[in-house]
Amino acid sequence: MLRETGVMNIECPATMRRHVQKVLGGEYEVPYRATRPVILDIGTNVGSFAAWALKRWPAAHVHCYEPLPNNFALLKKNPGSLEGQSISLNNFAIGDPSLKNLYLGRNNCGEASFYDVGEQLPATVEVETRAPSVLPKAHIMKMDTEGSEIDILSRMPSIDFDVVMLEYHSEANRRKIDELLADFFLVGGEIRSLHRGTLKYFHGRLVKAAGLLVPRRVG
């Protein structure tokens, strides 16, 4: 196990070190200025995003959702030590409630998934999955669910966050995500490789309020 320095120490397996450092370094940075945002961290893993978010928005409250038992144990040691103050911990998945068997990651504990997207082992762990209707209202939603993004977005009664940040794990899912987030504008992200990347969206009302609905003339 290694410990990374951010808003607090993050304990993680050595195979997660690079990923934790990237998140703590601002992978999910967006120019969102709310002072007390409620944040959903779906696919919390060991807690690096939650730790970064509490440094970025110190008065925020982060609701964490992590189904994998070993990850959840580390989460409780990391930002989960603030449970009841700035953090709420939930040891279940969000998505299709019929899905119970989570494939373990082939390379690290961040690759656990209900789907084989090329980075999973045959071994599975049985977990609990709840529908997105259990989620509280929030300003920001971050998702890193290794292929369950469409399961989650398509089951939401409404998608009314100010900010949505998520990873995608196939080109087909990326295009579907764009359809489901029709009221949002893509404001940032990173394409790491074919079928893999991070996307950041602002709701159209924020873009309209900033006077940016009409593209600026270049040249």
Regions found by a protein language model. Name each.
Residues 1-219:
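Phosphate/nucleotide-binding beta-alpha loop and adjacent structural elements of enzyme active sites
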